[in-house]
């Protein structure tokens, strides 16, 4: 789960000031087109240069306004109250030099219209999120961002997207003089990550996904080999699979000591200001980057040292046109990612790197990865032996964050006979609302229509919803009004509500899941994910014939993403997933072994 927009490399103040001086003339093209809209409120025309593409393009054209000069405007859109401003408009077949127009009728976030912008000077930037046309195997034709450009479905970082350099401009909503931006920059390709003695990177062509998407689709893999892999040619190994958001390389594994030039770790400040490790610049300010490198190097030394379980560690790269991650299950909109991972990628890894197979294969992850860990264990109960799901995305849709999609009529507000109350989407440590459901979904609608924002609510629709007549996911709720569609909710329940599925099918699932499930979550999870875990615990504790033998643990006042570590804050424990959960899974495999338990224990 992620409501945080990740930043590309930042542009600092000095660079922006230089750009402002050098490119102030770019605030209007030279010469500007004749003004045929006299008397019309503010209009901003955005075009791209023929030097960037000689052909017409489809996609989403975005206009960014910012009061903050420390980062590029395209990097500053988020659910936080500090978010800067964005507007977005769909374009089909936009030719070079032809403008997409942002006017007062175009939806924005946080302000809904250009008419609501306060007159003043802003850093201004345009971006074209380029779409590809897919002729899918289900007969649908859709226009979506390419899912395999190496950035993990991030519009501000996606290679091939067009943008303009930030420029300082005066914006006045009452002005009738049109403004113009030219997108004359292209985000370059992302270089590959080199292999090392222990870490291997490769891709596997998926026949299933290729058939669905109508063009070649690959699954990426980052594989960490155990110490002694080459010197023990007869050994066969368990497979520990880490699920989570897209990453270009294995995180929290560093083969060299920390960079001595980094800021020292200020642990007291990290605990106070960066308690969960994902508070952005606050973490960097207090030496968090060094802490990350320290923990990564500690894990490397443990991995290669005596006594650590000798296993294969697999991190899967499976971004889709809708998100940085497929959720590792089959979907009408994403395609058969569950089968592709389980029956194509994993067998390839195990056959080429001496894996032991299903009885010594387990999964772990947090947030999105937590849902995936439980999801694949439930969907493929005999193909995985053990799942550790930390702060999982909603695993019971009676607690779809703050919404019961089966009972509630509206996702944005709780409704009474005389009033409505806005629903929170995120809270802080004290329970105070950071962003509402309506605000978070408004942001996504501005970034992309038809579930194409690359955001959290949209990927849930892309994974869980049936495909609509237009080829795009059916909405679980109206993105502007919040009204829930009960027919879509019923489809979600029958196919992806993991607690409901376990309850419904326990007679057959129970014997295959017994003893395999571990859940961890903080009781103050920022996204209310603990509520669904409570409901899961109610079922798992009461399950009979057979009993579930599951474990459920809670962090007393811990936030997102608490993972069962009672001794350390989230900012630290999130960096120790691999050693903690590999050991936990290895102990489970030895306890339930039906095969080789000796060749890999050296």
Locate predicted features:
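Low-complexity, Pro/Thr/Ser/Gly/Ala-rich linker/spacer regions in secreted
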Residues: 31-38
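Bacterial N-terminal signal peptides that target proteins for export
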Residues: 2-15
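Non-catalytic cap/lid and distal C-terminal segments of serine-dependent acyl enzymes
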Residues: 51, 67-602
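Contiguous beta-strand segments within globular domains
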Residues: 38-48, 54-61, 218-222, 241
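Bacterial signal peptide processing site
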Residues: 27-29
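C-terminal motif of bacterial Sec signal peptides marking the signal peptidase cleavage site
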Residues: 22-25
């Amino acid at each position: 789960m992620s409501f945080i927009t990740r930043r590309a490399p930042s542009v600092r103040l000095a660079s922006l000031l230089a750009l402002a001086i050098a490119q102030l003339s770019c605030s209007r093209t030279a010469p500007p087109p004749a003004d045929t809209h006299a008397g019309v409120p503010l209009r901003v025309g955005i075009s791209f240069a023929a030097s960037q593409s000689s052909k017409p393009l489809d996609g989403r054209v975005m206009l960014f306004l910012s009061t903050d000069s420390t980062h590029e405007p395209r990097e500053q859109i988020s659910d936080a109250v500090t978010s800067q401003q964005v507007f977005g408009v769909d374009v089909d077949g936009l030719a070079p030099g032809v403008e997409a127009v942002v006017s007062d009728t175009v939806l924005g976030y946080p302000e809904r219209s250009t008419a609501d912008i306060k007159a003043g000077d802003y850093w201004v930037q345009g971006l074209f999120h380029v779409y590809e046309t897919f002729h899918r195997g289900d007969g649908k034709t859709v226009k979506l961002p390419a899912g395999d450009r190496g950035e993990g479905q991030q519009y501000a970082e996606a290679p091939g997207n067009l943008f303009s350099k930030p420029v300082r401009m005066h914006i006045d909503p009452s002005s009738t003089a049109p403004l113009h931006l030219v997108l004359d920059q292209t985000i370059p390709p992302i270089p590959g990550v080199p292999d090392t003695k222990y870490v291997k990177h490769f891709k596997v062509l998926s026949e299933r996904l290729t058939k669905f998407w109508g063009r070649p689709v690959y699954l990426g893999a980052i594989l960490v080999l155990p110490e002694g892999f080459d010197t023990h040619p007869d050994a066969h190994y368990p497979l520990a699979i880490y699920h989570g958001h897209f990453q270009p390389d294995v995180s929290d594994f560093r083969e060299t000591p920390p960079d001595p030039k980094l800021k020292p770790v200020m642990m007291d400040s990290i605990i106070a200001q960066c308690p969960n490790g994902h508070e952005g610049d606050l973490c960097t300010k207090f030496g968090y980057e060094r802490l990350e490198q320290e923990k990564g190097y500690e894990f490397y030394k443990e991995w290669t040292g005596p006594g650590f379980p000798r296993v294969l560690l697999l991190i899967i790269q499976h971004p889709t046109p809708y998100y940085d991650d497929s959720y590792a299950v089959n979907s009408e909109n994403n395609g058969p990612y569950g089968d592709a991972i389980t029956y194509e990628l994993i067998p390839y890894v195990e056959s080429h790197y001496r894996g032991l197979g299903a009885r010594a294969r387990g999964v772990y992850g947090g947030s999105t990865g937590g849902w995936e860990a439980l999801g694949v264990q439930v969907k493929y109960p005999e193909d995985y032996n053990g799942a550790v799901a930390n702060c999982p995305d909603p695993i019971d849709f009676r607690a779809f964050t703050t919404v019961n999609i089966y009972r509630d009529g509206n996702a944005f507000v709780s409704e009474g006979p005389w009033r409505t109350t806005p629903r929170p989407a995120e809270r802080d440590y004290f329970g105070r609302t950071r962003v509402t459901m309506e605000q978070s979904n408004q942001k996504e609608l501005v970034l992309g229509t038809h579930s194409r924002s690359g955001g959290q609510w949209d990927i849930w629709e892309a994974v869980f919803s049936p495909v609509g007549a237009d080829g795009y996911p059916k909405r679980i709720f109206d993105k502007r009004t919040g009204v829930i569609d009960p027919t879509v909710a019923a489809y979600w329940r029958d196919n992806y509500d993991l607690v409901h599925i376990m309850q419904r099918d326990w007679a057959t699932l129970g014997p295959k899941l017994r003893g395999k499930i571990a859940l961890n979550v903080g009781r103050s999870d920022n996204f209310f994910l603990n509520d669904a875990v409570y409901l899961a615990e109610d079922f798992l504790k009461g399950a009979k014939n057979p009993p579930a033998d599951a474990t459920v643990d809670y962090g007393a006042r811990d936030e997102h993403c608490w993972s069962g570590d009672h001794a350390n804050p989230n900012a630290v424990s999130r960096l120790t997933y691999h050693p903690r959960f590999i050991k936990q899974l290895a102990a489970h495999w030895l306890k339930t072994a039906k095969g080789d338990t000796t060749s890999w224990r050296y």
